[in-house]
Amino acid sequence: KENAFFFYTVFKNEFKNFILVTDDLSPIEIESANIEIISPVLKKGKYKWMGYFSGEPIIFSMQSTEFKTIVQNGDIEFKNGSSINCFLKIKRQIDNEGVEKIIGYEVVRVNHYFENEKPIETKEGKKHRQTKEAQKNQINLLDDLGLAIKEK
């Protein structure tokens, strides 16, 4: 990577706008991320999972209590290539040089997991999908009503 330097003049009255209150950046949220599981956590506790995301190995915390319970009860058998589709939150910070760094990964919700390449929808995944579909249908209904009212 090449280092590029940009110069910008900051006037005294604007200076306060350039001071960072925190080095935390807003997290990147991915609604439908696929993670291949390398190392699941089969025991209760706040242990970290390992997986592959976008071709890179990652360590992540599993926030989905429903999925953790399914795993701890032995209802899911993990094999080479087992994966999940999930809502992934990527936490970021900015360092002293202004470089963005990833500081953690969190799986907030598991939409579905795969058994023999067949997706199995979780209860929380189904609930989220139905809520999203209902919101979409409401918007479409309101749009249709809006058009009907405008045409009269």
Give each language-model segment a name.
Residues F67-F87:
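Short nucleic-acid-contacting surface segments enriched for D/E, G, S/T with interspersed K/R
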Residues P27-G45:
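Structural detector for short beta-strands of small beta-barrel domains
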Residues F114-K152:
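Extended, charge-rich, solvent-exposed interface segments
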Residues P40-F67:
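OB-fold (S1/OB) nucleic-acid-binding surfaces
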Residues K1-E31:
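Charged, alpha-helical interface segments at or near domain boundaries
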Residues K91-K126:
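OB-fold/S1-family single-stranded nucleic acid-binding modules
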Residues A33, W49, I84-C86:
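Hydrophobic residues positioned within well-ordered beta-strands of beta-sheet architectures
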Residues V41, G81-V99:
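A short, charged
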